[in-house]
């Protein structure tokens, strides 16, 4: 049986920590920022942990 290929789109979007948590960037900060408040754009910075239900699927796509 051949190995499963890593999903290249998922590998660009998600990172797995040493403890096994899946991290992602927040959506909504690429463009059309003019009408969004400074408070909103600041809150969209940084990474967040993915929900456990989604993390299982993502790990499968990444071959972990």
Swiss-Prot record:
Which PROSITE patterns does its entry note? RIBOSOMAL_L35
Q: Where is this region: Disordered?
A: 1-45
Q: Which domain of life is it from?
A: Bacteria
GO terms for molecular function, please?
Answer: structural constituent of ribosome
Q: Name one GO biological process term.
A: translation
Bias regions of kind Basic residues — which residues? 1-15, 27-42
Q: Which InterPro entries match?
A: Ribosomal_bL35, Ribosomal_bL35-like, Ribosomal_bL35_CS, Ribosomal_bL35_sf
> What Pfam families does its record include?
Ribosomal_L35p
Report the sequence similarity comment from the record.
Answer: Belongs to the bacterial ribosomal protein bL35 family.
Instruction: Give the protein's recorded name.
Output: Large ribosomal subunit protein bL35
């Amino acid at each position: 049986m051949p190995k499963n290929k890593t999903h290249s789109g998922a590998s660009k979007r998600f990172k797995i920590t040493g403890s096994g948590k899946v991290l992602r960037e927040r959506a909504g900060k690429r463009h059309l920022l003019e009408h969004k408040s400074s408070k909103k754009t600041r809150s969209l910075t940084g990474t967040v942990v993915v929900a456990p239900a989604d993390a299982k699927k993502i790990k499968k796509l990444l071959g972990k």
